[in-house]
C-alpha cells in the first residue's frame, strides 16, 4: 500500500482531533497492520492511547498487562455486538467503538474517546486503577483531563469511524489478495511489534522536552533496549536517537515559525542542552541554520 494512502487517513484523524476534540485509536486484533514496516510511522502511531492518564498508568507492569488483556475483551465485545457501541474501559475511560469486519471475522476497531459517560461507574474504575498502581490519588486529576468534549455525537462518530473502518478493510483485502495474510489467522508477533513501536513513539511525543534515553523508552514499553533498538532500525530505518531528534526538530521548526523566541531558548525548550549542537543537527536535517529557516518562513519560501 502506498504511503499516501495512509497519509490521507492520518490527515482525517488529525482533523477529527482538531475539529471535534476526539481521540481516535485504531485497534488491530489480528496483526494485519504490522505486515508493512512503513505503517509503524503512519497509521501505527494511532495504536496506543496517548492521553496522560493512560500513559501514567501503563508505566506499571500489572496495569500494562491489564491493558493488553483489555484488548482481547474488546475484540470479544466487538464480535458480539457487530455494530457500534459505547463501552467503558477497565481504567474508567468511555469510548465509542466501531468494529471493523472482514466477512464474519472482526479484524479491528476504530475507537473514539474524549467524552464523559457513565460517570459514577467510571470514577470507581479510575480510583481502582490508581489503587492498583499504588499511585498518589492526585493522579485522578489526569482522568478528568481526558474529557475534551461534553458529550458523544454518535451520529458523527459513526460516520467518521465507518470511513476509517472501510479503509482498514480495503487494506486487509489487498493483503489477502496478495497472499500476505490469510483469513481467520492471527499474527500475534505483528500485533506485539506494532504495539511496542506505537507506545515508544507515544512516549517520545509526550516527553520530547525532557532528557530521554533509550532505557527510559524501553522501560515504558516493558521490553529490553536491544529489542526496541532492533524494532526501530528494522521498521523505521532509524535509530532511537534519530527519531527523538526528528521529533524535537519538528517542534523547533514550529516554534521558529510561530514565535519570536530566541534560537538558544528554543534549543533548550526542545531538549537540546547545547545550542551549538542544536544548530548543527538542525542544519544537517534541513540544509539551513535555525535563523535562516525562520527568515525563509517569514518570506514564505519554506514550510515548517
Please give the residue ranges for each predicted region.
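Append "Primarily bacterial transcriptional regulators
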Residues: 215-224, 228, 232, 266-273, ...
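Sensory/regulatory domains in signal-transduction proteins
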Residues: 70-126, 160-164
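Structured interaction and signal-relay segments at domain junctions
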Residues: 2-5, 10-92
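…primarily DNA-binding HTH/wHTH and HhH modules…
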Residues: 280-304
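Juxtadomain coupling helices with adjacent low-complexity linkers
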Residues: 1-23, 108-185
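Terminal helix-turn-helix DNA-binding modules in bacterial transcription factors
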Residues: 234-274, 295-304
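Basic, amphipathic alpha-helical hairpins
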Residues: 198-212, 232, 236, 253-262, ...
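Short, Lys/Arg-enriched, Trp-marked, Pro/Gly-tolerant hinge/linker segments that flank
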Residues: 171-202, 206, 214-221, 234-246
